[in-house]
UniProtKB/Swiss-Prot annotation:
Organism field: Pseudomonas putida (strain GB-1)
Family: Belongs to the RimK family.
Gene expressing this chain: rimK
UniProt cofactor note: Binds 2 magnesium or manganese ions per subunit.
Protein name per the record: Probable alpha-L-glutamate ligase
Cellular component aspect of the GO annotation: cytoplasm
Domain ATP-grasp, chain residue ranges per copy: 104-287
Entry's EC annotation: 6.3.2.-
Source lineage: Bacteria, Pseudomonadati, Pseudomonadota, Gammaproteobacteria, Pseudomonadales
Amino acid sequence: MKIAVLSRNPRLYSTRRLVEAGIQRGHEMVVIDTLRAYMNIASHKPQIHYRGKPLEGFDAVIPRIGASVTFYGCAVLRQFEMMGVYPLNESVAIARSRDKLRSLQLLSRRGIGLPITGFAHSPDDIPDLIQMVNGAPLVIKVLEGTQGIGVVLCETTQAAESVIEAFMGLKQNIMVQEYIKEAGGADIRCFVVGDKVIASMKRQAKPGEFRSNLHRGGVASLIKITPEERITAIRAAKVMGLSVAGVDILRSNHGPLVMEVNSSPGLEGIEVTTGKNVAGMIIEHLEKNGGPNQTRTKGKG
């Protein structure tokens, strides 16, 4: 197969590993800088040009689209889809998962376990919003944040009110979530490929911190997940319409709660921690499922 990898940086661990795994399995791998691709949206013959030449003959495309280039990245990926190229994750599903609120709304509709979450616009509603998520301590998240940036733990109602007012004053869209104390600053990253959890790791926040993201100094370790956690992760990825996803789960007193479904999960943490060839499994999934003009939208909403 001839496989395109949409990535701004060919030197990133995840991009390198996907290219290596593809070459090892006998495929032609081409890394394309997402922002340097441009499109000809012509009737009957949609095209993508790159460095002055049209991109042709691709069987599949692996999107590694960073959060900051979601809009343009999804447009390029959608153009590949219009050309009949099979996407590992499709543009609609990526756009869906990048909107944290939309993701939670879709997951809640399907009855998937979530932390109680509030969303509001008007400052008059702050006291009721705080009560809605069972009061302080609570977590406030900026909707556009990634890698744990823009996430605040408020220990008291007073602190929560001040932080919410500050974010609202900056015209930031925010979510307010119950704090799951029993998770103890740890979450579980389940790596879903197709309809299986192929690898999972526990991420523990460093002392004095509650955000377990590896970018925030969290430490990864091996973990055995429960059947319920496995089913929750697979269902969450399916609701979002993602073939490959990093599903972040908290262990709570009332079962697994989904924090986030990531459409472009990093490979370094999971491969180094588990010793598994995750990149190889992703390429294998493409081989089994990829094919021309198989770009029907998965998921709803």
